[in-house]
UniProtKB/Swiss-Prot annotation:
It comes from Streptococcus agalactiae serotype Ia (strain ATCC 27591 / A909 / CDC SS700). The record marks 10 as: Discriminates between blocked and unblocked aminoacyl-tRNA. PROSITE patterns: PEPT_TRNA_HYDROL_1, PEPT_TRNA_HYDROL_2. This is Peptidyl-tRNA hydrolase. Hydrolyzes ribosome-free peptidyl-tRNAs (with 1 or more amino acids incorporated), which drop off the ribosome during protein synthesis, or as a result of ribosome stalling. The lineage of its organism: Bacteria, Bacillati, Bacillota, Bacilli, Lactobacillales. Monomer.
Length: 191
């Protein structure tokens, strides 16, 4: 069986470590101690890495389409590698959740997230597994765009690092158990 773990974000160094790139940050944390090297594939518009875990080929994906067109890369890779939607997890930021909180869902609307809107539009379904990482709402007069494209406050950096460890543990637990429902029950709502 083959699986695909996708972290959403924006390509380019100016977006490194921004809140909107929490999906890329999660992928980097997950592969940190694995034998994964990323190569940018311009045909698929993604950085692609892979490894074998428990005898299964796992693809780790960071779309380079920019957030709002993430569905282009996701659809192309699912099709090319013949991966079922049920064997894919999307990791992304959520404005409506407290900073550092994680939530697992098996289906649902985009909730205003343009990357998820793109994936839903290209796949033709809302039924795919996802891990949402809370980045909180902007304070005061800050716009949503400035908030999501901003970096985490110093106060939040340790919490986000711990959150990324939890996402790493959850994904590896899922890959061991092959059971997203069980993973949800164990890790949902952690902070």
């Amino acid at each position: 069986m083959v699986k695909m773990i996708v972290g959403l974000g924006n390509p380019g160094s100016k977006y490194n470590d921004t809140k909107h790139n929490i999906g890329f940050m999660a992928i980097d944390r997950i592969v940190k101690n694995l034998d994964v090297n990323f190569t940018e594939d311009k045909n698929f518009k993604a950085e692609i890495g892979s490894d074998f875990i428990n005898g299964e080929k796992i693809y780790f994906i960071k779309p380079t389409t920019f957030m709002n067109n993430s569905g282009i890369a996701v659809k192309a890779l699912l099709t090319y590698y013949n991966i079922s939607i049920k064997d894919m997890i999307i990791i992304y930021d959520d404005l409506d959740m407290e900073v550092g909180k994680i939530r697992f869902r098996q289906k649902g609307s985009a909730g205003g997230h343009n990357g998820i809107k793109s994936i839903i539009a290209h796949l033709g379904t809302q039924e795919f597994d996802r891990i949402k990482v809370g980045i909180g709402r902007p304070n005061g007069r800050m716009t949503v765009i400035n908030h999501v494209l901003g970096k985490f406050d110093k106060n939040d950096e340790i919490m986000i690092s711990n959150t990324l460890d939890k996402v790493d543990n959850a994904v590896k637990y899922y890959l061991q158990t092959n059971d997203f429902q069980k993973t949800m029950q164990k890790y949902n709502g952690l902070k």
